[in-house]
Amino acid sequence: MLALRLLNVVAPAYFLCISLVTFVLQLFLFLPSMREDPTATPLFSPAVLHGALFLFLSANALGNYILVVQNSPDDLGACQGTSSQRPQRPPPSTHFCRVCARVTLRHDHHCFFTGNCIGSRNMRNFILFCLYTSLACLYSMVAGVAYISAVLSISFAHPLAFLTLLPTSISQFFSGAVLGSDMFVILMLYLWFAVGLACAGFCCHQLLLILRGQTRYQVRKGVAVRARPWRKNLQEVFGKRWLLGLLVPMFNVGTESSKQQDK
């Protein structure tokens, strides 16, 4: 339990550090290298377009991250403890989280990177957080590849060029041919690639469970759920204003997921 609580503190700090490092690299390395194009117009220069797109992806990723933390699931155990009525039988999807020490409705899993449980209240923000984190990481990787290609005069036309970049760069770094800053960017390329793929896979997995009307806890425990139309399952999680929530981080308003009780 001590290890889990320690991980619950280290993982959010790790995510925030990676986000800060990514922002610094974009601001002080990638964007200045794009301003050197004299043929581009000031309004539609690559630096302006790249900066606007990166800020959009980062703002949505961090905004939904904050909403996941703020909109933590309600503690049903505390509500039943303060109620004077006879406690009802909890729905099959409720679960007691040992890390958070509370009972949550439609518990899916505990996310250590947010330090919070994922349930009915913050599921949509969690999925959008995974989506935009994946896009921001993969986009940063593409920008980093362009930067390394220009600085080190490396061609990535060959399919295996990215796979052989790390071992080749390590040997050149110890021989003095590659600077420490460039080596750090190369290491970040692989980190962005790994985090981007992991978040994309997790986002797709969560969407598949939502289409089926299930949670990870229900799948793990073998709890049977009532068959419902997939569109209704999506609406309960994303609400009627799903398009606005896709563009701007916002609280999941207008859904019935927090009021749903499993049969």
From Swiss-Prot:
This protein is called Palmitoyltransferase ZDHHC22
Q: What Pfam family is a match, any one?
A: DHHC
Record EC number: 2.3.1.225
Q: Which residues cross the membrane?
A: 10-30, 48-68, 126-146, 147-167, 183-203
Keywords for the protein's UniProt record, in alphabetical order:
Acyltransferase, Endoplasmic reticulum, Golgi apparatus, Lipoprotein, Membrane, Palmitate, Transferase, Transmembrane, Transmembrane helix
Q: Cellular location of this protein? A: Endoplasmic reticulum membrane; Golgi apparatus membrane
Protein family membership: Belongs to the DHHC palmitoyltransferase family.
Gene Ontology MF annotations? protein-cysteine S-palmitoyltransferase activity
Q: Which residues form a coiled coil?
A: none
The topology of this chain with respect to the membrane is: Multi-pass membrane protein
